[in-house]
């Protein structure tokens, strides 16, 4: 199998599992990833989703060997069709599903692999992780949502540097840039990430989903629009069982037991 899925309580872990190819994305992997993400997004019992890679890489992006035959004949792939069929649905699912998504970056994240990590809500990384927006090295522009996500995370100047120069970024730099949220020693990453996923999966899932939508929607709106969107989402959140449980737990001086409802 080129991809594995496991449940850990209310969290789903999706692992890109082509370690010998550094988890490069070929057709079967992309199809399986889209299917796994769609299933997790639609399952109310899943309340947080982690994406990681097997072996020493997170993901090095598109598997160019899959396209080698066409290139040797002087034919470039149909990029519009490829992006529409595979990368756009995957990135939309990671970014827009109404529950937290977390990239657990255990090693190299490059090209479209970096784009996948950017589409997640949080990025937790190993101290040995390395990052590269590698598109310019093969004469392409960044895709799979990276031109939208990257400048919003690290700023326009830093995004331009990563895109145009194509330098490797190590874990400490990634943390300083705001590219990742937290970095741990390699031997601690899985344990710490599992704890973070468990905490997210135990949280107020509906409120998390609305928070995601508000942050993303309001990046392109004015204050008036943001205030209106917040009010609408708050009315809906205020009617949830999780809200009542949160307030009750606060008044009773105990931890809340959120059910994602």
Regions found by a protein language model. Give the residues of each.
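Short, charged, surface-exposed hinge/linker loops at domain edges
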Residues: 215-221
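Hydrophobic alpha-helical core bundles mediating ligand binding, dimerization, or RNAP-core interactions
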Residues: 84-91, 197, 215, 227-234
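Conserved CoA-thioester-binding segment of acyl-CoA-metabolizing enzymes
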Residues: 1-54, 92
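Crotonase-fold acyl-CoA enzyme core
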Residues: 92-208, 222, 232-240, 244-248, ...
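Hydrophobic alpha-helical membrane-association signature
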Residues: 29-32, 83-86, 189, 230
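Glycine- (often His-adjacent) and acidic-residue-rich active-site loop
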Residues: 53-93, 109, 222
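Histidine-centered beta-alpha loop that forms part of the nucleotide-sugar donor binding/catalytic region
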Residues: 17, 62, 106
